[in-house]
Amino acid sequence: MSGAHGQGTVPVGEPGPADLRLVPPALAAWATAALTPDAPPARTVGIVLGCLACGVLLLAAGRSGRAPRWARGRPEWARSSIAAVLLCAAAAAASAGLHGADVRRGPVPELARRSATVTVEAELTADPRLSRPRVRGDHTAPVAVLVQARVLRVEESDGRSTRTRAPVLMIVDAGTPAPGGGRAAWLRLLPSTTLRATGRLVPALAGGERTAAVLRVRGGSGPRVVAGPSGAQRLAGRLRAGLREATDGLPGDARALLPGLVVGDTSRITPELDDAFKATDLTHLLAVSGSNLTVLLALLVGPPGLARLAERRGLAPRLGLSLRATALLAGALTLGFVIVCRPDPSVLRAAACGTVALLALATGRRRSLVPALATAVLLLVLYDPALARSYGFLLSVLATGALLVLAPGWSEALRRRGVPPRLAEALAAALAAQAVCAPVVAVLSARVSLVAVPCNLLAEAAVAPATVLGFAALATAPVGLPLAKALAWCASWPAGWIAEVARTGAALPGAGVDWPGGWPGALLLAAVTVAVVLAGRRLVRHPWWCGLLGVLLLLAVVRPAPLTRVVTGWPPPGWRFAMCDVGQGDATVLAAGAGAGVVVDAGPDPAPVDRCLRRLGITRVPLLVLTHFHADHVAGLTGVLRGREVAAIETTGFEEPGQEAEFVRKEAAARHIPVTRAVAGEERRTGPLAWRVLWPPADTAPAFDGPNDASVALLVRTGGLRLLLLGDLEPPDQQALLRSPRAAELAGVDVLKVAHHGSAYQDPELIRLAAPRLALISCGTGNPYGHPAPPTVAALRAGGALVLRTDRDGALAVGGGEGTAGPGREVEVTREEP
């Protein structure tokens, strides 16, 4: 190798086959660390002593020439490898046992079993973060602040104080965000900060993170800080805060994504954006990962494609740095990267792998990243055995291993068949990573993404510029905020592209398919993947077959509406009304012309209602009616708004619960959608639809007992059918409808959307008057409320109604009634096939 690439060039030969000698010891340590933390101490000691004795005996016997009987006849390298596996397993068992004992040691676990109220002095070990909003029944569970910490001192109610070092998860009920206090004050805390908190200890969940207990804290007044963070964490905090300030003026997606992509700050990531990244298997880009460090090191030491060589590319030779100086500078960069980005599994893996590679670079020797990766895994699981059970760590290692082992061969095969080199490398990398990671993702999500590979290909081109410009903004923010804002603005273009790829991919009707969850499902998917890879090796020799299969896959992902209707029969031609299957909640659609539909309620989760509207072909919503503000009717609002033109939102005037009402106002204001109040007597028409609002009253509202009493109720006419939609009206309000001047119009409706998910609280007189031929109930499978109530179903059937429910029958579509009037008109109902 000539010296054309700069000072310090080291002659190297052609790289040989990958060195796999460290792989078995690393896997043995990983498996042992994953299996032994919860083992009884005696069993752990037995494993350690047994493996240690066998390993030492094998090494000693090999040197003396008297090998054990089971090892005789084996070559020296095999005996050494077996000994290394045994010794690494012993070390991992010892480390896992000590860490497990550390969790169980001290008074915290016993206090947690007694649900004791204590005052602790604790040191933060990670950045505080917000829990994700969850719908529980008709309310959204309060968002809490989650804090990983290490308890240094615990004081019991009797005044007894004990020193300890127990890891805990603090769940802080800090109320709503408030400048200078409450939730905001907790979220500003930095790792290594020491604070005092009073709360109730409860046992940690089995199989969760490595914690001795959970401490539930009421922290509305803010944290009580005992000691501030370390100097390194203060510097990292200033840098991260500077990046947030530099990105404040960016568009929504780039503002949320850029801090996460650069330093792992995901505080601005919305649940909707998070779901889009999960649906497209782009979560490794949502937060900082080892790829970020790879990009930075590549700028310094050269491109990753030369990783097997002591290359002299990048900025280092142009700055006149020697080989060892380059390694030292890269090591300092790696350490700073881990501190600023926090030691997440992927970051730790990348840092350890990079450190081993840098040591090889400093000595000027040949290196291979496969042993570097194996060494990283070995060191990390010995240092922190909890990583052995981390899905993030597993995905990170699998993806890196696929890129090192599978991708080069696949790339070469693609190049031999005429694929351009750059495209072949990118395609092989995406395919290899997806092949090995998909089974693990299926364990977590019970779903397989069909758009992961193209989305990763499209996003990958933007990762490097977004990362480099983002880190430049991070470094310049403390000294020149205007320059940092300019750099962040430049970075917002590639970051916005990544977010748009995720949203577009997730919005495709066939973006993913349901798959059996758990490890049995993972094994099944792994078997299918192996079969596809083996078949693919034969298919690449037949371009026409490849093209045909590609077209079929494209059709399965895009699912054109005419083709989908022919294949699945959904939605049925001429449908008038559809009830979406959104679990324990309500979301219904009234057809209002080609691609248009009036949506009544949005369900408890954005994904199901978005999927339902997509399958129905709804792209325009002339009106979205939210009958009341319970979470099981409005929490899915962003799913209705996703990628659709929504002209207006109409709601009840009773704005409780306040949290959900504020959520609706905020989302509507962000998209400039007018919000109006529905009042009894209001009549509207759009396309083939005509409806009148029956409730709530137009005059001064009565003293409602709760949001259900203020539900918007509608009487709808479409295509000769009459539908009565009752929201969640309670019996007193149903009785008030019977006393209204136009109550006679409620008689003999074709379709009844049963109030309150078919609960037992129904007015029998209204059911008898309505006398529906079809009664539809929206409820969730196995819901804790017993919906629908057997007496309600019995009363409806006694009146001659066909009763269908989403928990058993899935999504439902109603048609018929064209050109007919009166009791003889036909009502057709279609169930969506799973």
Show which residues each predicted segment covers.
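Aromatic-rich juxtamembrane segments at the membrane interface
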Residues: 2-34, 207-350, 578, 600, ...
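Membrane-interface helix/helix-cap signal primarily in integral membrane proteins
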Residues: 1-23, 66, 70-284, 515, ...
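Hydrophobic alpha-helical transmembrane segments in multi-pass membrane proteins
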Residues: 270-452, 517-564, 569, 650-653, ...
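Transmembrane helix-bundle segments that form internal channels/tunnels in multi-pass membrane proteins
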Residues: 5, 9-105, 118, 402-578, ...
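Non-globular, low-confidence helical/coil segments that flank catalytic cores
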Residues: 17, 184-187, 270, 278, ...
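Short hydrophobic/aromatic residue motifs in ordered secondary structure
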Residues: 35, 129, 137-139, 144, ...
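Residue-level signal for inorganic ion chemistry
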Residues: 32, 122, 392, 437, ...
